């Protein structure tokens, strides 16, 4: 937060936390309390926090992220009243949960949406592929978000700089076909 203020970054992406198999409720509460403290401090510094919806891990994984599904993410937003805590919508994370991209977006809409993170996958596991290498319908996603009047920014979340350049060009071509 201090570095963001110093370099005038204006926002910091944050995660709700993680849990192990037996400590879900305790970790969920600890994550919320940490985000509240961070929100208070960030507000005083003039920095916005963006809570990212995370990816689910396989059921047999030792560690699981928090804020992976609509219910968990809603818990955090309902209990984080700070106007300076927005949403970083990671589309490829939503693509691997049952409600999908549209269902996850519709649960929250534009109210807190500040950033849309873009990568592709095939909907079956956590991947950050170059757009066009998976099966996300980016035209449908852009139409859904842009038709609502989104005024935030998009961010590429995959690969190296060359991958991002190629992915950006793919997405621009997709936008031209809308």
Q: Over which residues does each language-model region extend?
A:
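Catalytic cores of phosphodiester-bond-cleaving enzymes
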Residues: 39-59
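Structural motif corresponding to the early beta-alpha repeats
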Residues: 1-33, 43-48, 151-153, 158-161
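Active-site-proximal beta-alpha loop/turn segments in soluble metabolic enzymes
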Residues: 16-24, 53-63
